[in-house]
Amino acid sequence: MKLPLRAAMKVAIYDLDKTLVRKATFTPFLAFAARRLAPWRLLFLPLWIGLMIGYRAGFYDRTTLKTLGMKLMLGRQELFQLEKVGHAFATRHISKAGWIPEVSALVEDDRRQGARLVIATAAFEFYARAFARMLDIDIVIATRWDGRQIPGGNCYGEEKRRRVLEALGDARPDTSLRFVSDSFADAPLLNEAQEAIFITSSARKANRAASRGWAVIAPQG
């Protein structure tokens, strides 16, 4: 996918979880979708927690973790079903968790300036697009799902940077890039951006981000 860009255009890219949205999305999505599509699979939630512990212990990577989570909690589902439940989930998640107001204000500032708005996230595309529509953002770079596996791997860290630069294509030298994220895993893309903004309420993380030359926004509430 190539971004539709004009010469010397500003591109403003936002992470989703804990950047635009206050809380993470994947585990809440698995529970929400299982309740809608396969309620008996809610019995597997303790197993899912065990899988997350295994990931943190270094037994497998995030792509494997998310693939196992989808298969365990949802089984085989058609993409249109996942998109439908993903829309319902996004609506519910925002009603409970909410947007981060300081970041929403940045989005509107970028919009007024005529920037091309993009969400780049490790979240699955089939529900990330539902969040994007709420913000009137039509470009989403996210983790894909084909019903069995994750083509191209998790859109995370260096892979996210690669996909964004691929989308910028030949326009990259003339593009002013702002990237907003809450995660040090996004350092490859934060370091690439002319304007890097880190979202955190942690003083320790704020100091670490500032030491890398990134601006810091501390969400309130």
Task: Describe the residue ranges of each PLM region.
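A general structural signal for well-ordered alpha-helical segments in protein cores
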Residues: 26-27, 66, 161
